[in-house]
Amino acid sequence: MAASSELRLVSWNVNGLRAVMKKDPSFVGVFDALDADVFAIQETKLQEGQIALELPGYHQTWNYATRKGYSGTAVFSREEPLQVLRTIGAPEADDEGRVCALEFGRYWFVDVYTPNAQPELRRLSTRMAWDAAFREFLVGLVATGKPVVTCGDFNVAHEEIDLRNPDTNHGNPGFSDEERGSFGQLLDAGFVDTFRARHPDLAGAYSWWSYRGRARASNTGWRIDYFLVSADAADRVTGAAILSEVMGSDHCPVELTIEL
């Protein structure tokens, strides 16, 4: 087998791909500039056939929600996947297009858009069931013997350092004890938060800002977009970054470089 090579992986919640296509720079402009080996997106808000994206040199993998204009994920990869999985065994959310799991020759790549717990945590039970099923799904992929890289919008700020105003957000969606604990269980199951592993004390590093109240201008944000790797690949990570200068969505892209 050929020697491993450094891969550049990018994840971005675009909050509606059609909207980002119309912005300057457009999605394709950002995509071309970042020049990733694998580019994952979440919250495409598309139905099949609504757009035809021209990305020469990339294989396109899509997962659409049954409900129109909602959720959805996609992965654009230079390497052709050996297989693609689009469900994880979470009945209440498996029809929402939330996962694209691609098996490549050397590793698994899993793009995820985790269900939001919603105001008053009214969808928390669905969220907890999803987290448990996703954790079991990832552990199952690790058992195949290949390293696992998973990325996307996990809809949780894990620790107080991961959001600007933890004191006023305790118990809110994305910062409830249940969601934070569940994310901790995923790490305990053998996954590493790559950004925090490389930047353990870096405050003010966020990937999502509310559209309200000039939150992005004042950097009143949350870090809810992650790249996690299975423990067997942690020492292969060469870089982890948040690309906060990239506009077009209420999220910015996050990036991982890794030798696989």
For each predicted feature, which ranges?
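Surface polyanion/phosphate-binding segment centered on an Asp-His-Pro turn
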Residues: 241-260
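Conserved beta strand-loop-helix elements of the APE1-like EEP
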Residues: 68-84, 212-235
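Metal-dependent phosphoesterases centered on the DNase I-like endonuclease/exonuclease/phosphatase
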Residues: 132-220, 224
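N-terminal, active-site-proximal structural segment of metallo-dependent hydrolase catalytic domains
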Residues: 1-55, 65, 70, 158
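Structured beta-strand-rich core segments of catalytic domains in phosphoester-bond hydrolases
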Residues: 45, 50-119
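Catalytic metal-binding/acid-base residues of hydrolase active sites
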Residues: 15, 45, 113-115, 155-157, ...
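Active-site-proximal beta-strand elements of phosphoester/diester hydrolases
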Residues: 7-17, 106-118, 151
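Surface-exposed cleft-lining segments at the edges of enzyme active sites
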Residues: 89-90, 115-131, 167-172
